[in-house]
Amino acid sequence: MAKSTIQESVATGRRKQAVSSVRLRPGSGKIDVNGKSFEDYFPLEIQRTTILSPLKKITEDQSQYDLIIRVSGGGIQGQVIATRLGLARALLKENEENRQDLKSCGFLTRDPRKKERKKYGHKKARKSFQFSKR
């Protein structure tokens, strides 16, 4: 099997139920999310800015890399944060010297909060049924 000449970094990010796989390779700045363009999948500017913030921190010119993102599960905001974490981890694989910059901005921190399970005898995870003393 021939070795590929394209050097790429692959990393995974998670948030709640969202899982994102990010492929980072040298290129012209093309971003592909689940077969769609970046602007189509994430229509809000704040979402795109959040995702690309690790890349802006490391490089001045964002057109150095092509991104291929596969994301599934969760809601849009969970997918945004999962993709940001995946991109930060891919940049870290690309160059280990970036660790201090990424860590100081909190891009390498995985948010551990998940949905709390529903308990029996309760309506929801913490909400109880109405209590009647008499």
Swiss-Prot record:
GO molecular function: RNA binding; structural constituent of ribosome
Coiled-coil residue windows: none
Region (Disordered): 97-134
Keyword set, alphabetical order: Ribonucleoprotein, Ribosomal protein
SUPFAM superfamilies noted in UniProt: Ribosomal protein S5 domain 2-like
Keyword Ribonucleoprotein among UniProt keywords: yes
UniProt KW Ribonucleoprotein keyword: yes
GO CC annotation: cytosolic small ribosomal subunit
Biased composition (Basic residues): 115-134
Family: Belongs to the universal ribosomal protein uS9 family.
Upper classification of the organism: Bacteria, Pseudomonadati, Chlamydiota, Chlamydiia, Chlamydiales
Gene Ontology terms describing biological process: translation
Descriptive protein name: Small ribosomal subunit protein uS9
PANTHER family tied to this protein: RIBOSOMAL PROTEIN S9, SMALL RIBOSOMAL SUBUNIT PROTEIN US9M
Cystine crosslinks: none
